[in-house]
Regions:
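Conserved aromatic-histidine-acidic binding/catalytic patches
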Residues: 5, 50, 54, 164-168, ...
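Helical scaffold of the NTase/Pol beta-like nucleotidyltransferase catalytic core
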Residues: 1-26, 56-59, 254-255
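Charged catalytic carboxylate motif
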Residues: 8-12, 61, 175, 233, ...
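Hydrophobic, Leu/Ile/Phe/Ala-enriched alpha-helical segments that form helix-helix packing faces
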Residues: 13-21, 65-73, 241, 245
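Structured mid-to-C-terminal alpha-helical surface segments
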Residues: 187-255
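Catalytic metal-binding acidic patch
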Residues: 29, 33-64, 78-83
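Conserved NTP/Mg2+-binding pocket subregion across the NTase superfamily
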Residues: 63-166, 173, 179
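Extended, basic/helix-rich recognition subdomains
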Residues: 154-213
């Protein structure tokens, strides 16, 4: 069930796209998967526009739309959207115009996102992913997950300053649990399922409890001593855990 402020933002966003007559608008992530928490979860969207609608003036109009929403709707800071066309949707490695983290950028629509769209994507407008977005082979999904753990998350563990921030604690541990489930069982899991899985993977229980409390309850500000200890405990867990996961699955998923 979508909360009132989220529903209002989505209505305004879809209304703003109306002049471009989008082929489709889809939600993935927590908003589609059933673990959405208003004000805490991101709103992860994909919009497909017709080829002849995509030009420089279109990009400017989209940036203007996001900036207006950001100024008028508090939740808009959480809204991320990548813009594809039917012709560019097939390229998993291709970068697309994206609004995320308060600004425009170009980035790919990853194999994980593509699998989410096919597995539990939510159609907000127009056509479903089938027929527009090619399915992702299991081997491609597994290879991406291993590469993401090895090339992005493992080097990040060594950057101590990052891990004093909630977002790195949350995403680092949850992404690792989700990667483990994908590689072991071939399935995508929600953040709630990832948190349930983490203690069995050896994650520190107090860190898991901290993430759970901040996501699902009303968290109190963390004391500096806990922030430092949490960072150390998370890094001490994730480094060896990622190394073990990559060692176990890296060779099997290598192209």
């Amino acid at each position: 069930m979508t909360d009132e402020a989220t529903a209002r933002l989505l209505d305004r966003f879809l209304g703003g796209l109306g002049a471009l007559d989008p082929v489709a608008v889809w939600a993935h992530g927590s908003l589609a998967g059933g673990d959405y928490r208003e004000g805490r979860s991101d709103l992860d969207l994909i919009a497909v526009l017709e080829e002849n609608a995509f030009r420089l003036s279109t990009a400017r109009a989209l940036v203007g739309l996001h900036r207006r929403l950001r100024a008028e709707e508090p939740l808009a800071r959480k809204l991320h959207c990548s813009y594809l066309t039917p012709a560019t949707a097939a390229g998993a490695g291709r970068s697309h115009l994206t609004w995320a983290h308060d600004g425009p950028m170009r980035r790919p629509v990853t194999p994980v996102t593509r699998c989410e769209l096919h597995t539990f994507g939510r159609v907000l407008h127009g056509r479903p992913p089938e027929g527009l977005l090619p399915p992702v082979p299991g081997s491609e999904l597994r290879a991406f997950v291993v590469r993401d753990q090895k090339e992005f998350w493992r080097p990040a563990v060594d950057k101590a300053r990052l891990w004093r921030q909630d977002v790195w604690i949350d995403l680092g541990t949850i992404t690792h649990a989700r990667a483990t489930a994908t590689l072991r069982e071939g399935r995508l899991i929600t953040k709630r399922e990832a948190l349930d899985l983490l203690p069995g993977l050896g994650a520190p229980q107090d860190v898991v409890d901290d993430i759970t409390r901040r996501r699902y309850e009303e968290p109190a500000p963390a004391a500096p001593a806990w922030t430092d200890r949490r960072a150390e405990r998370t890094r001490s867990y994730l480094g060896p855990a990622i190394d073990s996961l990559v060692a176990a699955y890296g060779t099997a998923t290598r192209a």
